Amino acid sequence: MVPPLDLGSLVDSDEEDNFSQTARGTVHVHLNPPRSEPALGWVLPCQRPNSQHRLQEVEQDVIPEDLPAPTGKYRLKYQQYASEMKDGYKQYIQRSTEKPKAASRPEATEKVEGASLDDLMTLDRKALLQQGYADSPYGRQSITRKSDVETVAIEKKKQTVAEQMMMDHLSRAVISDPEQDLNTKNQESSRVPPDSERAPLRVRRRTLHETKIRTNSALTENDLSQKVEFDGRVLSRNGRDACRELIGFFFAHDQSLTVYEYRMFGKNRTSVLPFIKKDIYHHQCGRRKGKQYELGDVYTGATLTFLSCDQPSLPKTIKENALLRLRITNIDQVALNSLKAASAEHGEEEAVSPEAHDQLVLQAIQDKLKEQLHKKGARILTGLGRYFQGLDKEGNGLLEKADFQQALKTFHLEVSEQDFESFWLILQGYGHSKNKVDYGEFKRAIFGEMNEYRKSFVRKAFMQLDFNKTGIVSVIDIRKCYCAKKHPRVISGHSTEEEIKSSFLETLKGTCSKCDEVSYGEFEDYYEGLSIGVAGDEDFVNILRIPWRI
């Protein structure tokens, strides 16, 4: 309770003596406001806005009977005080209303509308909550047990594919080799005069003594055993194609290669189908365009390019693009070292050195951008994917140089003009079109990408969510499968499971093209951005392994 303020002694100095003689026993006032309406309003302890009649009665009770009227000097001081308070209050209200407006101005341009600076910072903080799993303790015994089971399943899968490959190439009889018909045609052309009509069918038939015991394309088990086995994946934003399980073989005896796809229907039924037929292939882009693939071109992280029109077994979604890009994710290093030691290759360093120089240029640009993306990588990379998808009107993934320059400005990513020109020349050499570049290749080249070990867990997490193998996952399924029980903030009691789950879904949905579903490309971009801020591979794997229970 505020003690009563006695204003009876506030009089002019000239009248102080006269006022001191006034009987103070009659003064039972708490506050006596002036007759004029005050600027800020006087609020009495008993005043209520909904009872005006009661207010008048209270005012009449507290007015002293013999209080002298204020002098002109006192009235002037009061008016000055009231005007100063009124002006100060107006300035305070004006400042408080201007601060939220300044904070709510959008930072990005037309493609990043509707997000204020505070909102963007909030989304970044919520995305960084996922990095808490990196420090979460996880049972080593459980990890070892699961990895052992997974290793056995992978070895069994590779053995099945290798057996099918051997059967396909050894079961074909030499007598039915197409090369036998070529020999017959050459013999016919030497027998039949040029001016005569085409020889009858009986002449064109191949007899037994004209059949070769072995053709150039005939293979033996010894030839097929000199091989390097590798795992691969399709570089595509189409989730169904990106998650295909591919196993390839590079044969040292003729520098040829083939790729098979391992399919699983349900829990027990499997199928092994040829994906890329066995043949000798050449680079389709880059500094080595037109040169034949060699043993030195096969390593973890290498990208193999093929013309999609030359592969009859490819699905329609892949044939829509002129080039098929295949990334080697894992390789049999023991077999690779053995074949390299057996075949002393020459000139390999000279062939690789220009590409190594290109990698150094790209690495320098990537290091500069990673500093800018350290805290906000998830939001920017997913936002860029959505931005490029909106510009891709034809649906082939190809964009022009001006589109990429505008994208960097839109997302406030600083790249010098000299660095961008060097980067663009390198990227054009790796593309199939002259003036346009695939925006997926652009992102991989300018920002870099996580290593294949990390990427394998991203694919595992998405494949676990994609029950129907469509390449698209609904937000409802993500909410059902995401588990936040082992998040450090949940264990310590600072957050609930629902809060961690909601923050993850909010940051993921905020940058997706559709609010109720997430594509593989968007899912990959999200974790690609998180990967920038995580140094250790095992720490990043925990971010995926713990909530998705991989």
Curated annotation (Swiss-Prot):
Query: Where does the chain bind Ca(2+)?
Result: 466, 468, 470, 477
* SUPFAM superfamilies per record: EF-hand
Q: Where is the composition biased (Polar residues)?
A: 181-190
Highest taxon listed in the record's lineage: Eukaryota
Q: Which InterPro entries match?
A: Ca-bind_SignalingProt (IPR051581), EF-hand-dom_pair (IPR011992), EF_Hand_1_Ca_BS (IPR018247), EF_hand_dom (IPR002048)
Annotated stretches, region: Disordered: 1-20, 175-198
Q: Which keywords describe this protein according to UniProt?
A: Calcium, Metal-binding, Repeat
Q: Which residues form the EF-hand domain?
A: 379-414, 415-452, 453-488
- GO MF terms on file? calcium ion binding
Record's PANTHER family? CALCYPHOSIN, CALCYPHOSIN-2
Tell me what this protein is called: Calcyphosin-2
Which organism does this sequence originate in?
Mus musculus (Mouse)
Query: Which gene is annotated as encoding this protein in its UniProt record?
Result: Caps2
